[in-house]
Regions:
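ABC family nucleotide-binding domain
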Residues: 4-177
Length: 177
């Protein structure tokens, strides 16, 4: 059996609020293999967003280990985590987080700038991914010229553009049309 794509062991995440410590994640163990689809479900306040932030390398655990694609990311510094996020993780946010005065093509190509691709490589790959989500005819439109479902598909295309190891999506089908 191949190494898991994600392996977290005894992950804990605490937050200090004034004089109080809030124990949000209390020793989570999880393994996700390549090709698996996993849904995090639970009531509000159960720690889903906190776990997603840890899995997405947007936060680090209070304790425990997180191995992502063979690399221990649990103790990495911010600049190392930024590189991991750009290369390994695609995000689809519930609110899309698209740049409002930027075309769909440029919104999708944005992560490739940070990955060091040339403008021609960015445009070619972003065009390819926008075609995959059936938005070839809307590439030059800004977000306010797109429906909610089209904006969601731009966000999905942006998550896919760097060919990440994992996709983290917050309610990814909530606005599709």
């Amino acid at each position: 059996m191949a190494n898991p794509l994600i392996k977290i062991s005894n992950i804990k995440r605490d937050f200090v609020l004034g004089n109080e410590i809030v124990y949000v994640l209390k020793g989570i163990d999880l393994q996700i293999n390549k090709g698996e689809y996993v849904a995090l479900m639970g009531p509000s306040g159960s720690g889903k967003s906190t776990l997603m932030n840890l899995l997405g390398c947007l936060d680090t655990p209070t304790s425990g280990t997180y191995i992502l694609n063979g690399k221990d990311v649990s103790q990495m510094k911010d600049d190392e985590l930024a590189e991991i996020r750009n290369k390994e993780i695609g995000f689809v946010f519930q609110t899309f987080n698209l740049l409002p005065r930027t075309t769909a093509l440029d919104n999708v190509a944005l992560p490739m700038i940070y990955a060091g691709y040339s403008k021609s490589e960015r445009n070619e790959r972003a065009t390819e991914v926008l075609k995959q989500v059936n938005l070839a005819d809307r590439m030059d439109h800004q977000p306010n010229q797109l429906s909610g479902g089209q904006r969601q598909r731009v966000a999905v295309a942006r998550a896919l553009v760097n060919k990440p190891s994992i996709i983290l999506a917050d309610e990814p089908t909530g606005n599709l049309d």
